[in-house]
Every structure is written in structure tokens, then in C-alpha cells.
Amino acid sequence: MAFFRSRLFWIAAVTVLVAALLPFWISAYLLSVLTAAYYFGVFAMAWDLLFGFAGEVNFGPTFLIGLGAYSAAILNSTFGVPIPLCVIAAALMAMAGGILLALPALRLRGPYFGLVTLVAVLLLQNFVVIFASVTGGEIGMTVPDVLSIDANVNYWYALGFLVLCAVLLFGLSRSAVGLILQASGQDAVEAAALGFNVTKHKVAAFCVSALFSGTAGAMLIFYMGAASVDTVVDIAIGVQIIIAAVLGGRRTILGAVLGAVFLIVANEFLRPLGQLNTFVVAAIALAVILFFPEGLLGYALHRGERE
């Protein structure tokens, strides 16, 4: 209950309230940018659960996102399955893929786990291209159904989904399971010596991360109306997700949302700079990571504790 009296809770509550009212104040274009940013925020939060708490660096978050997105797209486009069932199926498919990837990968140590997740993304990219008759190949595939054609409704869907995921993931991170994950990530040997099943908890974390990633991937394609390698599987998208989570603050969960919103909005507004766009955003992100290694939210929280 102490959390509900904390400054972080009230800041989050006011932020959500203001965000919910934004459709009455800003243009449809800005709403579309923020809508995409909110889905990326869920991607970043899911990645932070695995890295920030379990201590495992997943270099291929788009493998899980892509599994969910393409599963939903194929079911909707080919078989006419309604959106809610497609989203559920996408979550289950991503979880299944997460389990199949996590069980062998977590037996590895050091950088090898990250390399396995990166290779998984490359395999999925090749699968999409090879089976173009089913997936649409490099062009991508459209879905006949979308969440809404109204920008305001799409925005509220994304915001509501983001808030729900944030509450669930933040609650998990503060639970007994979250504390065990954090202990396992910081010192797996010591955690095992205390009697915790480190591998089981890390596999569970991978599955939870996959669940949220796959669900968000499905929601994103039903917002955009299409699934393609460039939007849900590309390695560059995965890099952006990782930067967003680190930028916001490791082990904060909510900081990942701040990082995602910053990256997406900055990329959009700096688009007129052309090739300088990526350079400027990367330079800002690098400066924040170097001077504020705890991330933006992590730095703010620790500074508040010191005061």
C-alpha cells in the first residue's frame, strides 16, 4: 500500500490522466505517433523484465514480436478469425516460441544466450521471405480487420493497453517472483545456493516477456493494418527497443515507456533532417546512457531518495 502513497504513483496517475485527454488537444498526426510509441513502450517493458530483472540480454526481441504479429495477421487474413481470438492466439504462439527458445538458450552463459536470440530473429526473417505465399514476403501482408479507423479510438486502445501492461509488469516486478528474478540476475550462483530454481524462474520471465511482446505485436498490426519485416521483425526495431529500455532505466519497467516515447517522437520530429536524424537521436541516447547509466527514470528516482 505504500506505493499508492508514493510520489511515483501520483506522477504516473497524473501522466495517464493527461495522456487520456490529449486527443482533445492535439492533431490526429501527433496521436498516430504516440499510438505507435505506446505499443513500443510495451515492447520495451517486456524486454526490461528479462534484462533488468532476470539479467539475460535478449538481442532479438523482434523474434517474439514477429511471431505474435504474423500469427495474428495470417489467422485474420487467411482464415478470417476475429481480432480478439487472433490476439489471444498471437500471445500463445509467442509464449510457445519463447519456451522453445528459452529452454536451450538459458543453458548457455555469457554472450551466447544473446547470440542465440539474435539468430532466432534472422531465422524468422528468412522464414517470412521463403514462405512468401503465406506471409507476404518482403512486401508484407495486410489484414482485413483493424481496431478502428478513428484516430482517437486507436489512441485510447493503445493507451489502455499500455497502462494495463504497465500495471501487470510493474506489479510482477515488485512481487516475490520479481525479487527472486532480481536476485538471480545479480548473482545466479548465490540465488541457487539459497534454494531458488534459477533456470525455472528465468524461463518463466522469458515466457512472460514473450506473452506481452506477442500480444503487443498483434495489437500493433491491427492498428497499422499490415505486418511486414520492416515493422515487426527487423533487427533495427529490436535495437530501438533495447535502447528505449536502457534509456528509461533498467529495472524500472515504467522507465521503458519514457524511453520508447522519446525515441519514437524524436525520430518523427527529426525526420526532416534526413540521414542526420538517426545520428542526432543516437547521440542523445548515448549521452544519456553515459552520463545517466541508471536511465532517466532511474536517475530521477534515486535523486528523489537522496533528497
Regions found by a protein language model. Name each.
Residues S173-S213:
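Intracellular coupling helices
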